[in-house]
Amino acid sequence: MLERIKDSFTESIQTKIDAAEALPESIAKAAEMMVHCLLGGNKILACGNGGSAGDAQHFSAELLNRYEIERPPLPAIALSTDTSTITAIANDYSYDEIFSKQIFALGQPGDILLAISTSGNSGNVIKAMEAALSRDMTIVALTGKDGGAMAGLLSVGDVEIRVPSNVTARIQEVHLLVIHCLCDNIDRTLFPQDEQQ
């Protein structure tokens, strides 16, 4: 059992090393897009299922509250938090529409959708992306494995941050690190700090 625990740490470290080689440019581009969105008076909507729903909420909380520096709140909404809305849509329509219907109501041109799925094949996240595209929103997709069907929906103006792993747990671990990198870049671009602080 101890070896298995050590192996999990080793695999996680190696996946992060691989991600550090593969992902910085796409993370920087996504952060730049998010800064542009926020400076334009727009907002970021985030969605995912299970652990990815938690990641969407984590990202939203970091923007609405703060990440590491004191700053004004930034507009972000996790679409996975309103149980009344989610269960009403799932009951009356389909679970695949729990995010897309919210995007049709809340999304505006210039907003960004942060779409999170370790497989890239979550039906409701794909529907959310389709809704975002119809609302002239930009998409930042956090994926893993081969990018799944989500990768095929992205256009030149969108960004995919695909973790180089096929293991769901390792992908989720890197997704959290990517979210922290995005928050750090957003904060330091919008609110430059003296590095001495």
Swiss-Prot record:
Binding residues annotated for substrate, in chain numbering: N49, G50, G51, E62, N91, D92, S117, T118, S119, S122, Q172
Involved pathway(s): Carbohydrate biosynthesis; D-glycero-D-manno-heptose 7-phosphate biosynthesis; D-glycero-alpha-D-manno-heptose 7-phosphate and D-glycero-beta-D-manno-heptose 7-phosphate from sedoheptulose 7-phosphate: step 1/1
InterPro entries: GmhA/DiaA (IPR035461), Phosphoheptose_Isoase (IPR004515), SIS_dom (IPR001347), SIS_dom_sf (IPR046348), SIS_GmhA/DiaA_subfam (IPR050099)
BP-aspect Gene Ontology terms: carbohydrate metabolic process; D-glycero-D-manno-heptose 7-phosphate biosynthetic process
Superkingdom, taxonomy of origin: Bacteria
Positions annotated to bind Zn(2+): H58, E62, Q172, H180
Cofactor: Zn(2+)
Miscellaneous: The reaction produces a racemic mixture of D-glycero-alpha-D-manno-heptose 7-phosphate and D-glycero-beta-D-manno-heptose 7-phosphate.
Function: Catalyzes the isomerization of sedoheptulose 7-phosphate in D-glycero-D-manno-heptose 7-phosphate.
HAMAP family, alphabetized: GmhA
Descriptive protein name: Phosphoheptose isomerase
Lineage: Bacteria, Pseudomonadati, Pseudomonadota, Gammaproteobacteria, Alteromonadales
